[in-house]
From Swiss-Prot:
Gene3D superfamilies xrefs: 2.30.30.30, Nucleic acid-binding proteins
Pfam families with a match to the protein in the record: EFP, EFP_N, Elong-fact-P_C
Statement: the UniProt record of this protein carries the keyword Cytoplasm: yes
One annotated Gene Ontology cellular component of this protein: cytoplasm
Family membership noted in the UniProt record: Belongs to the elongation factor P family.
One GO BP annotation of this record: peptide biosynthetic process
Protein's recorded name: Elongation factor P
Lineage: Bacteria, Bacillati, Mycoplasmatota, Mycoplasmoidales, Mycoplasmoidaceae
Main localization (coarse): cytoplasm
């Protein structure tokens, strides 16, 4: 049985269930009034759909959602899913490709990630903030185009296109931010 949490005790990062939906608190505010109970408003993310809404939860008692986060490594991809393996137990799980629309751009063999599960349902994948990934193709640098840190387009091995400095070449490894999808630096 999951524990009960009062709406006024919710903080950023807490998870709870409401009407069969699983929410993650992004922001919360508590406005105290003189004559009545305080008003609790939370900006929440539905972990199943990814939608972000603002909910008024004044006076509610909510069931806390215990989200399990398991560290796993990417093994392979088939047509509809990505397969990850727990390096300690060797358990393999399939994550539906539709849950990884953005993340798939940064997942290569042995990429480590935190798989989020609620009971037996997979909710998503948290990648590290930065990953080392290989450039599949980079345009040649244009001679004389060195004004103001000129950038060129490069395609990662996953097919994702990023902008990189002129000195980056095909088959080089670079560090890319998974937060904004931008080039960070060369990898050593």
């Amino acid at each position: 049985m999951a524990s009960i949490i009062h709406a006024k005790d919710l903080r950023s990062g807490h998870t709870f269930t409401l009407d069969g939906k699983i929410y993650l608190v992004i922001e919360n505010s508590f406005n105290k009034t003189a004559m009545r109970e305080g008003i609790v408003k939370c900006k929440v993310k539905n972990l199943r759909t990814g939608s972000i809404t603002t909910e008024v939860l004044t006076g509610m008692k909510l069931e806390q959602a215990n989200i399990e986060k398991v560290k796993m490594s990417f093994v392979y991809q088939d047509q509809n899913s990505f397969v990850f393996m727990n390096n300690e137990t060797y358990e393999q799980i399939e994550v539906p490709a539709k849950l990884l629309e953005y993340e798939k751009n940064f997942i290569t063999e042995n990429t480590e990630a935190l798989i989020m599960r609620y009971e037996d349902e997979i909710l998503g994948v948290n990648l590290p903030d930065q990953v080392v990934i290989e450039i599949d193709y980079a345009e040649d640098a244009v001679q004389g185009n060195s004004v103001n840190n000129a950038l060129k387009k490069a395609t990662l091995v996953t097919g994702y296109v990023i902008e990189v400095p002129q000195f980056i070449k095909s088959k080089e490894k670079v560090i890319v931010s998974t937060v904004d999808g931008k080039y960070v630096s060369r990898a050593n």
